[in-house]
Amino acid sequence: MPSEHGTALVTGGGRGIGAGIARELAADGWSVVVAARSPDEIDSVAEEIDGRAIELDVSDREAVERAVAVVGDIELLVANAGVAGPDGATWEIDPADWWHVQEINVLGVHLCCRTVIPGMLERSSGRIVITASGAAYLPGSSSTAYPTSKAAVARYGETLANELRGRIPVFFFSPGLVKTAMTGHWGDDLPWTPPELAPRLVLVLASGRADALAGRYIHAEHDDIEDLIVRADEIVANDLNAIRLQR
């Protein structure tokens, strides 16, 4: 597969936001590997974009390590795989179901990142983009599992960006309220985010033009990424778009 930019690994790439990101990257000249647990879906997306498909459970350390070894040099990791988890009263949810959300949404991000980072450091090249969520900052009232996982992911992304600053840019972003198979049952009257915004944002983050914003929280709908790039020095100097307590 000819590639202008290198290889991008997109987890959770068989549907929804991940599939949109895979399509956007492929259209821009990336060689895209689509990874997820659903073989039919990833095969379909991979065929559509002339990419590759790898069946992958991101919470399985050995499976992640095998997948990264098979793919080879990864220039861009989009750690997007996630599940919404069980709704209902926290005290009534099976702890195994609650913990499963953390395994996919948090451990899965960590395993993918820790596995690709050594190669990126060795090549002095690469970027990481993590799909977070506004649920990290705006807790709902129907489940503790999902917002807990996304709060952890946001802090993980910010901290990892600090660890790798000056070496590997790490971004985390909220795609907004996108209507997907995971969220579509919530109803039609919600303020749904246009599905094309997240893929467009990831494309900019992958380009290198936004590297000064590594470790800053970015919202695909509420933030204008081009404006943020222009204001990057101000944002860093004043510690804006950061996770913090308000007092």
Whereabouts are the PLM-identified features?
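Residue(s) in the substrate-gating loop at a strand-loop-helix junction
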Residues: 133
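Alpha-helical segment proximal to the catalytic Tyr-Lys
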Residues: 118, 162-163
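Conserved mid-core segment of classical short-chain dehydrogenase/reductases
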Residues: 84-99, 142-145
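Conserved glycine-rich cofactor-binding loop
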Residues: 14-16
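Catalytic Tyr-X3-Lys loop
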Residues: 91-110, 125, 129, 153
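Active-site helix of classical SDR
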Residues: 113, 149
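The beta1-alpha1 cofactor-binding region of Rossmann-like NAD(H)/NADP(H)-dependent oxidoreductases
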Residues: 55-66, 95
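C-terminal helical subdomain
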Residues: 172-173, 188-247
